[in-house]
């Protein structure tokens, strides 16, 4: 099967959707499918041979963050040319509501179209502005996928259409067997934060407020930070706590897995804006117990607290208590690790890719190819 995938977000920087698209493409290619990917990317970015760059992206506020998207008249011709050259049996669009490549492709493409909805934002400027235009375009989508129940419910409420729920995937074996960072695990214990730490919704300020409470019981605890952000600003914000912080910066998938394998606890202090919780799944696959905010998306991944510790979002005192409880209790951590290992099986790419493939096969039953509207 010839499969065309479109990612709206730039490959210049790592992100959940970008990673999902690349990993799905790799799994499908390993299964013998012919896959091509179109995504924004700068000329100096190294891309797999099956990825075609649609050109540079620009920062645009979207879904409570700043996403690097591509939305200009020049994109129209690039998308059309890629679709014609691809001769695809199925076109798989990711985030067709984002003002970028997927939206352009949905405008011009016809035939076997699949779309995955990753976000569950309840307030979308893009949707409010383009809703009248988007609805008829969305009628072209034959197979709809939502990565979570939240994303599915949002799609039903905002667009009046339903979707099959298929979660994001992870490579469980790769994460569980990753090597640890040199010098880890530490005797003084390590708490891992992963994400863009200067985005308020990621909750770094809550974690910093909780850290002194953790230090009362573990005076040599280290906060290991992986991700992008203004390091100097965070150092200033942390004050005297900075001696207990190690910045790894932006790392590749192997570095992320190593960091997860090296931590005693993974902490997700997010305060909102999450539709899934892929990093929680990755941490559990790596064998690291999780403490996370009690957001709907995280609660579903952690099975209402059965496979990870949930705390009220924004409550630094509760977060400190939860971190201390796990760091001082080896038996509790081991219980969460064992429960997490069982829970992540449904997220392994061997399962997720098969579910997505069934959607492809369903929409392609007519035998018609993806066409470009005249």
Swiss-Prot record:
Gene3D superfamilies in UniProt: Glycogen Phosphorylase B
Site (Important for catalytic activity): residue numbering on this chain: 118
SUPFAM superfamilies: UDP-Glycosyltransferase/glycogen phosphorylase
Entry's Gene Ontology molecular function annotations: GDP-Man:Man3GlcNAc2-PP-Dol alpha-1,2-mannosyltransferase activity; phosphatidylinositol alpha-mannosyltransferase activity
Membrane topology: Peripheral membrane protein
GO terms for cellular component: plasma membrane
EC number: 2.4.1.345
Catalytically driven reaction(s): a 1,2-diacyl-sn-glycero-3-phospho-(1D-myo-inositol) + GDP-alpha-D-mannose = a 1,2-diacyl-sn-glycero-3-phospho-[alpha-D-mannopyranosyl-(1<->6)-D-myo-inositol] + GDP + H(+)
Pathway: Phospholipid metabolism; phosphatidylinositol metabolism
Top-level enzyme category: transferase
Residues annotated for GDP-alpha-D-mannose binding in this entry: 9, 16, 196, 201-202, 251-253, 256, 274-278, 282
Residues that coordinate or bind a 1,2-diacyl-sn-glycero-3-phospho-(1D-myo-inositol): 18, 62-63, 68
Cellular localisation: Cell membrane
Keyword line: Cell membrane, Glycosyltransferase, Lipid biosynthesis, Lipid metabolism, Magnesium, Membrane, Phospholipid biosynthesis, Phospholipid metabolism, Transferase
Main location class: membrane
GO biological process: glycolipid biosynthetic process; phosphatidylinositol metabolic process; phospholipid biosynthetic process
Cofactor(s) required for function per UniProt: Mg(2+)
Oligomer and partners: Monomer.
Record family assignment: Belongs to the glycosyltransferase group 1 family. Glycosyltransferase 4 subfamily.
Free-text function comment from the UniProt entry: Involved in the biosynthesis of phosphatidyl-myo-inositol mannosides (PIM) which are early precursors in the biosynthesis of lipomannans (LM) and lipoarabinomannans (LAM). Catalyzes the addition of a mannosyl residue from GDP-D-mannose (GDP-Man) to the position 2 of the carrier lipid phosphatidyl-myo-inositol (PI) to generate a phosphatidyl-myo-inositol bearing an alpha-1,2-linked mannose residue (PIM1).
UniProt-recorded name of the protein: Phosphatidyl-myo-inositol mannosyltransferase
Annotated source species: Mycobacterium leprae (strain TN)
């Amino acid at each position: 099967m010839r499969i065309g995938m479109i990612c709206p977000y730039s490959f210049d920087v790592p992100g959940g959707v970008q990673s999902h698209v690349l990993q799905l493409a790799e799994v499908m290619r390993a299964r013998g499918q012919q896959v091509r990917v179109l995504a924004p990317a700068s000329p100096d970015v190294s891309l797999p041979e099956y990825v075609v760059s649609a050109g540079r992206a620009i920062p645009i506020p979207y879904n409570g963050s700043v996403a690097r998207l591509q939305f200009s008249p020049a994109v129209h011709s690039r998308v059309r040319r890629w679709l014609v050259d691809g001769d695809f049996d199925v076109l798989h669009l990711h985030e067709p509501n984002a003002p970028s490549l997927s939206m352009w492709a949905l405008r011009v493409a016809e035939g076997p179209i699949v779309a995955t909805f990753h976000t569950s934002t309840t307030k979308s400027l893009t949707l409010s502005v383009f809703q009248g235009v988007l609805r008829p375009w969305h009628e072209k989508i034959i197979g709809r996928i939502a990565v979570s129940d939240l994303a599915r419910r949002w799609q039903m409420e905002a667009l009046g259409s339903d979707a099959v729920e298929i979660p994001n995937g992870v490579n469980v074996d790769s994460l569980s067997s990753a090597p640890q960072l040199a010098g880890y695990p530490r005797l003084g214990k390590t708490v891992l934060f992963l994400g863009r730490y200067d985005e308020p919704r990621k909750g770094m300020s809550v974690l910093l407020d909780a850290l002194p409470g953790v230090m009362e019981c573990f005076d040599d605890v280290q906060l290991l930070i992986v991700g992008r952000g203004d390091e100097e600003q965070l150092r200033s914000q942390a004050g005297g706590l900075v001696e207990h912080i190690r910045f790894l910066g932006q790392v590749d998938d192997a570095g992320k897995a190593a960091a997860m394998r090296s931590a005693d606890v993974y902490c997700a202090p997010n305060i909102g804006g999450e539709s899934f919780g892929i990093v929680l799944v990755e941490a559990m696959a790596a064998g690291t117990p999780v403490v996370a905010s009690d957001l709907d998306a995280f609660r579903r991944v952690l099975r209402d607290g059965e496979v990870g510790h949930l705390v009220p979002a924004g409550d630094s005192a509760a977060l400190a208590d939860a971190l201390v409880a796990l760091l001082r209790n080896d038996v509790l951590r081991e219980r969460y690790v064992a429960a997490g290992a069982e829970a992540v099986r449904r997220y392994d790419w061997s399962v997720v890719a098969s579910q997505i493939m069934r959607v492809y096969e369903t929409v392609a039953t007519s035998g018609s190819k993806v066409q470009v509207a005249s």
